[in-house]
């Protein structure tokens, strides 16, 4: 079955803003509380550690994007280095993580809306899934346009948190960490979820006008911008509300704003959180569908999933993602669905970092001299940091990720993946 190409229409600024949108997203709104409970006033340091891990991994994505600027980057990059079977494992792990993350945030949206309107969480989550499905069907440009508007709203909420906390910065001791390095590392493992999204930019490679030039730039822009915002949010949050109280709050950032500006500001921030959660889900669903498209086009998933509709959207892949998402939000809880996401993502990132290190060491990248050394050392450090955070992700998450790895390795061994036409 012939694979129809996607339409190349996205510019650098469109992809950069969508990257900022999916990274900023809902994770920080919900997870900054539990992270503060672990790290204390040194919460900012946990964001730096998580951001450093994500940023060094983003370097691997940026370098590898020049070699394989195609959708489903985890599959493409790992397969380029180690073959299609490991690529299948890495790509499918990230695909599962994306769908799990989208379901997690959708349930979070449902909870926020239930708090404001009183309608059941599951009904709200399903309604959001249907509404975003309609937006996705319109096409990638329309989806990105909606995402850019929502990105502005979610950034406004975080800037509000920063502003209300700035006057209290000088009086705050930012080195107080009751649990020391262990607490900071555990907090970094928790809030690593808030950095997920930069990797999704690779799933828009086949719809970018100049992916070889613009994809690495978009990765750099989105990572730097979001890390700066996150650190400033962390500084303000613990300056206004005690870290222990943040850890016990279901809506920590709303608590921060409400403490300074009153209960009406609390409601405003909750509305902005709805925009943040909706934006994250929209971009995760769009990226997940294109990841499936990329793997189907490469021959490791059924060719039908590479079918492109009249709006230049991978229709069957999108329907599959929406269906799985709907099932997850009905049968799962926020904690159940979110439990393994970080661990699965960290394992997939380890595959990507190992891929760049291996390709550079074997002189299979076009770089020379110092740049080739950097392509070996930087992903090696990122690999170690990913492993460090993985060890602090919790036993249940580790066991779940290990179980998925075993299942995918068995599926890859029993299938005919090497003969499915993977294109290097």
Predicted regions and their residues:
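Transmembrane alpha-helical segments of multi-pass small-molecule transport proteins
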Residues: 47-49, 116-140, 158-161, 315-324, ...
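Membrane-interface "cap" regions at the ends of multi-pass membrane proteins
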Residues: 1-31, 38-42, 55, 59, ...
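A generic transmembrane alpha-helix motif of multi-pass inner-membrane proteins
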Residues: 344, 372-424
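Helix-loop-helix connectors at the membrane interface of multi-pass transporters/channels
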Residues: 1, 79, 105-125, 207-212, ...
């Amino acid at each position: 079955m012939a694979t129809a190409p996607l339409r190349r229409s996205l510019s650098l600024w469109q992809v950069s803003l969508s990257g900022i949108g999916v990274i900023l997203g809902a994770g920080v709104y919900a997870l900054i509380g539990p992270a503060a409970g672990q790290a204390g006033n040194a919460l900012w340091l946990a964001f730096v550690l998580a951001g450093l891990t994500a940023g060094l991994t983003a370097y691997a994505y940026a370098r590898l994007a020049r070699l394989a600027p195609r959708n489903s980057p985890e599959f493409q990059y790992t397969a380029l280095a180690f073959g299609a079977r490991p690529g299948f494992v890495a790509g499918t792990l990230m695909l599962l993580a994306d769908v799990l993350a989208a379901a997690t945030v959708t349930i979070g949206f449902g909870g926020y809306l239930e708090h404001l309107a009183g309608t059941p969480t599951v009904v709200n989550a399903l309604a959001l899934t249907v509404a975003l499905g309609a937006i996705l069907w319109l096409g990638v440009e329309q989806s990105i346009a909606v995402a850019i508007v929502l990105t502005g709203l979610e950034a406004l909420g975080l800037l509000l948190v920063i502003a209300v906390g700035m006057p209290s910065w000088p009086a705050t001791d930012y080195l107080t960490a009751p649990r020391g390095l262990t607490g900071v590392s555990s907090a970094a493992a928790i809030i690593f979820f808030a950095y997920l999204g930069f990797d999704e930019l690779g799933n828009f490679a086949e719809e970018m006008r100049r992916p070889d030039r613009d994809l690495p730039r978009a990765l750099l822009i989105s990572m730097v911008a979001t890390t700066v915002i996150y650190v400033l949010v962390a500084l303000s949050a613990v300056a206004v509300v005690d870290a222990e109280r943040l850890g016990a709050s279901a809506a920590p950032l709303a608590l921060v704003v409400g403490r300074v500006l009153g209960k009406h500001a609390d409601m405003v921030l909750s509305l902005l959180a709805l925009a943040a959660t909706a934006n994250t889900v929209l971009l995760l669903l769009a990226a997940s569908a294109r990841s499936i498209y990329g793997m189907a086009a490469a021959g490791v998933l059924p060719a039908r999933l590479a079918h492109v509709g009249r709006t230049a959207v991978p229709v069957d892949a999108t329907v599959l993602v929406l269906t799985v998402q709907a099932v997850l939000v009905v049968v799962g809880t926020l904690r159940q669905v979110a439990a393994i996401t970080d661990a699965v993502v960290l394992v997939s990132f380890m595959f990507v970092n190992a891929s760049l290190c291996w390709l550079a060491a074997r002189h299979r990248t076009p770089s020379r001299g110092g740049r080739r050394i950097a392509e070996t050392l930087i992903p090696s450090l990122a690999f170690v940091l990913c492993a460090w955070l993985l060890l602090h992700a919790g036993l249940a998450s580790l066991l779940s990720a290990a179980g998925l790895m075993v299942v995918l390795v068995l599926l890859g061994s029993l299938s005919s993946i090497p003969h499915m036409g993977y294109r290097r």
